[in-house]
């Protein structure tokens, strides 16, 4: 009997190499090559097919483009992230830490959709009895939900052919295996091939398919990167296990906006949408406190009010710069701008900055709020009640406009905020009722204005 040929496959990009190397020659990642058995030539017949239906060459203007019809899932926050609902034939990949609530969210969505279409829930991690027990604990009806406990791809495809569901959940893609491959479930080859087959089936049948994906210790989706490329939508389920709040964030969406977020609260009856998520990210102080400034940030298309807290304290021989929820390098840059252009020195001080509620802020529009919070903490004087700020700060000390400034200001006014410092380019042409707006062009103007408030 001939000895099986051994190859080494990168678990990050899926590239192969005949011998082990510390660094993948394809993507440059370290310690990602894993030993596997090479597939014999001729195996996997008809595996190499297009994910979508092939068509002859035609002029773009002549192709008839129909509007994408969406079906609401019954969960408003999930619909917001998806762009309004599920799309026929769309493939969604959702990842998150173990126990974060992925299966709970999808079971609730399946139950809600079962009232208007045929649905199928395929579980490879639980038995059918366990799924039923969880559904009863959540108070779900489940009378129209079809459940299959299976990990073999060919049997799942046969079930999809027989049942003809309009919506299907695969929990999870890492547990599936195909008879065409000899590698173990969860390997790069198995994940890639199973996802490709399911995507092909979804496009051909029009069945919307949701794939649940595992994540690595670093928080990235496990499996080859190609998995994220072939699906239509990639969602990340985020949240602290010590908190009851969860965020669903769209990283990729062919049918809607990216970086859109949905906010859920975990209750004893499952996940409930949070209609006013700004309340989560704002602290409830009886009186204004030094070092606290409210920022209006954008998450996708949704304006959110987030409290930025800063603490400036006398440091030792090597002052520290720590930030939670914001980029540390950007904090160091802002402190240099504050010193050079506003004359506020923090070189011998420890500076700590935190975004309340565990939210991650990546947009530069947070710069001005961070600087004002630091200045407030350094002076030991609180900002006025009902104060907000936003704007990007450049190295020359200029305050640049933030995108969609009018929407940010209207959201702040709606929630009862009364004073704002914003970039001059974001100042509204018409006054906003109940909101006093101070427009600035430079950092030193903002700091000087702050002293007079």
List PLM regions with ranges.
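Peripheral, non-AAA+ core regions of ATP-driven protein-machinery
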Residues: 2-12, 16-80, 87-93, 100-110, ...
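Divalent metal-dependent catalytic cores for phosphoryl transfer on phosphate-bearing substrates
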Residues: 128
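P-loop (Walker A) phosphate-binding loop of NTP-binding proteins
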Residues: 97, 124
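Conserved RecA-like ASCE P-loop NTPase motor core of nucleic-acid helicases/translocases
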Residues: 119-123
